[in-house]
UniProtKB/Swiss-Prot annotation:
Protein family (similarity comment): Belongs to the NqrDE/RnfAE family.
Record keyword Transmembrane present: yes
Upper lineage: Bacteria, Pseudomonadati, Pseudomonadota, Gammaproteobacteria, Enterobacterales
UniProt EC number: 7.-.-.-
Residues annotated as transmembrane: 5-25, 39-59, 63-83, 102-122, 134-154, 171-191
Key words of the record: Cell inner membrane, Cell membrane, Electron transport, Membrane, Translocase, Transmembrane, Transmembrane helix, Transport
Entry's Gene Ontology BP terms: electron transport chain
Native source organism of the sequence: Shigella boydii serotype 4 (strain Sb227)
Name of the molecule in the record: Ion-translocating oxidoreductase complex subunit A
Length: 193
């Protein structure tokens, strides 16, 4: 049980996909201007990452390894992610048309979000079992969502702050992301390896 708790906390804080592994930076920078959009993107990404991790583990364990088709792993995972994203897009369109319009192009771009593919590939490379894969996908997504919401809150405050002209816009956003990354590095002392 403590292994699962360590995996959960470690993936969210210590090995955060955005601030430590630098995966998923496109939606991190692109959707982080309004809190509602960031929360919606975080929820959609959480759903996709968790479901894609589970499906990727199942396909790898039951199809690719038994048939000795491991060389098709990346292609198979990309196809799985595309199917899961299309399913998510249909669900969001039916349940929340406003969120669907707010997310715009970023919802289909979850397909190309390298964090989603990274979670699926890392699950296999780390030798996770089914529960660990599901938990790892969920924790990575929670970490992604947490960082995105925090970053969005900071960006909203910076939008009304008196920032010097050369630092306005993306410049201060990148500086803020770097400072957040440094802050999250402090969590690495929580886990002794």
């Amino acid at each position: 049980m403590t292994d699962y708790l360590l995996l959960f906390v470690g993936t969210i804080l210590v090995n955060n996909f955005v601030l430590v592994k630098f995966l998923g930076l496109c939606p991190f920078m692109g959707v982080s201007k309004k809190l509602e959009t960031a929360m919606g993107m975080g929820l959609a990404t959480t759903f996709v990452m968790t479901l894609a991790s589970i499906c990727a583990w199942l396909i790898d364990t039951w199809i690719l390894i038994p048939l000795n088709l491991i060389y098709l792993r990346t292609l198979a995972f990309i196809l799985v992610i595309a199917v899961v994203v299309q399913f998510t897009e249909m669900v969001v369109r039916k349940t929340s048309p406003v969120l669907y319009r707010l997310l715009g192009i970023f919802l289909p771009l979850i397909t190309t979000n390298c964090a989603v593919l990274g979670v699926a590939l890392l699950n296999i490379n780390l030798g996770h079992n089914f529960l660990q894969s599901a938990l790892y996908g969920f924790s990575a997504a929670v970490g992604f969502s947490l960082v995105m919401v925090l970053f969005t809150a900071i960006r909203e405050r910076l939008a009304v702050a008196d920032v010097p002209a050369p630092f306005r816009g993306n410049a201060i956003a990148l500086i803020t992301a770097g400072l957040m990354s440094l802050a999250f590095m402090g969590f690495s002392g929580l886990v002794k390896l």
